[in-house]
């Protein structure tokens, strides 16, 4: 994992404004059910809905225990969580946690295109909803 994170830090340092001169975060592989409990505080959600988490209280990235470094999308999930780690350790300020997604999704998309020639066309409306501090269901 150390070599993978080093490579991703090099890519992020070259392609973003992030300072990547930081220690590597801890990366844990965890069963999906445990990830759901940790994030949602229950286990009543789609079984595969969480692809990764970043716990800023202890600089830890959590990935499903079946994470596969050979899969371009799964590699991009690790990159996405590394973006959150770098936002944290670089002291970036956000109005809310969701606002951290404004950088992570486009960077993940760019990584997939540049490295794997993979077109990830995520739903832009969904992106606006999950990266905004306002409640999209309460006008």
Regions found by a protein language model. Give the residues of each.
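Disulfide-rich extracellular modules and peptides
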Residues: 135-136
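Short pre-active-site segment immediately N-terminal to the catalytic Zn-binding motif
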Residues: 61-78
């Amino acid at each position: 994992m150390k070599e993978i994170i080093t490579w991703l830090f090099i890519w992020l340092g070259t392609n973003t404004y992030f300072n990547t001169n930081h220690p590597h975060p801890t990366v844990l592989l965890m069963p999906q059910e445990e990830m759901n409990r940790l994030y949602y505080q229950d286990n009543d959600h789609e079984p595969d809905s969480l692809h990764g988490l970043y716990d800023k209280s202890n600089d830890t990235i959590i990935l499903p225990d079946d994470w596969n470094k050979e899969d371009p999308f799964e590699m991009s999930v690790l990159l996405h969580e590394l973006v959150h780690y770098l936002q944290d350790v670089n002291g970036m300020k956000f109005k809310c946690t969701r606002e951290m997604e404004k950088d992570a999704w486009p960077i993940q998309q760019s990584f997939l295109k540049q490295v794997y020639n993979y077109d990830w066309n995520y739903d832009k409306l969904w992106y606006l909803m999950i990266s905004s501090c306002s409640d999209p269901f309460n006008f």
